[in-house]
């Protein structure tokens, strides 16, 4: 990884603080996980990340704790969305990547039954490909959201996603184009909340371009992580999701089962 990228990650992350946040009150590992993998020097551990800044920060935390534990690490960051990186970890090109429980479950289970963080984990163990497993989930989440401006919320009395129907017509949402096919995208908005919506693609994963599209009135709604400083900086309103359209997205390491036990223990020490 280029030195400038490494410095940017460490500066933005406040690495020690982020590690502590990830480690707080973990949700636990699979009690039936196999412990028979053997530590070996058979090639580097490949740590991947999504094309999303906070995911890259978490991936770098994993990479550094693995190196501290004595493993050789190859970094493959900014890979893209699940349609790209999940086939790579399934094939063995990637060893570990930070994931988000609810989104990962909805990728593999088209009609999941889970509604909370614990049941998301339980169901994941039943649907993941045979060579993959998850380690301990953190209490920390990185949720998707449906967010509006304060002016829009006040004008239409919006507090919940269901209230978007008050806008009338087709609601426009600034978000990555992938949201158009996600279960909690337009199809989910219609089936769960009766809201007619369409995606206005902005490919920066809730970043400045997405925020600008919302604040300048280009769109009605934006998918911005609730943890983003842009929420408070722009006095935005994250709409409530009483029907759990968006499942809990606790940060969860997705790993190959062949990962050495020592490596999984090192990741678990900061992940959960």
Per-region residue spans from a language model:
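Ligand-binding "clamshell"
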Residues: 108-135, 218, 230-243
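Hydrophobic residues within well-ordered alpha-helices
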Residues: 89-90, 211-215
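Paired acidic/hydrophobic, glycine-rich loop segments that form the ligand-binding mouth/hinge
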Residues: 95-99, 219-225
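N-terminal export leaders
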Residues: 6-10
């Amino acid at each position: 990884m280029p030195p400038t990228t490494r410095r940017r990650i460490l500066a933005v992350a406040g690495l020690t603080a982020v590690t502590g946040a990830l480690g707080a009150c973990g949700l636990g590992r699979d009690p039936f996980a196999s412990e028979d993998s053997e530590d070996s020097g058979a090639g580097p551990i490949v740590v991947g990340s999504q094309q999303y800044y906070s995911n890259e920060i978490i991936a770098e935390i994993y990479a550094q704790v693995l190196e501290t534990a004595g493993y050789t690490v190859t970094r493959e960051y900014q890979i893209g969305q699940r349609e790209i990186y999940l086939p790579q970890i399934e094939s063995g090109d990637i060893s570990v990547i930070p994931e988000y429980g609810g989104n990962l479950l909805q990728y593999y289970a088209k009609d999941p039954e889970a509604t909370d963080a614990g049941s998301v984990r339980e169901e994941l163990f039943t649907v993941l490909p045979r060579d993959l497993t998850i380690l301990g989930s953190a209490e920390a989440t990185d949720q998707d959201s449906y967010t509006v401006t304060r002016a829009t919320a006040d004008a239409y009395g919006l507090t919940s996603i269901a209230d978007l129907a008050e806008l009338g017509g087709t609601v426009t949402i600034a978000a990555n184009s992938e949201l158009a096919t996600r279960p909690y995208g337009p199809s989910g908005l219609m089936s769960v909340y009766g809201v007619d919506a369409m995606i206005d693609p902005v490919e920066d994963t809730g970043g400045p371009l997405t925020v600008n599209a919302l604040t300048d009135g280009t769109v009605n709604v934006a998918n911005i992580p609730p943890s983003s400083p842009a929420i408070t900086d722009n006095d935005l309103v994250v709409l409530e999701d009483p029907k759990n359209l968006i499942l809990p997205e606790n940060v969860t390491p997705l790993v190959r089962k062949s990962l050495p036990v020592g490596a999984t223990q090192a990741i678990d020490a900061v992940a959960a």
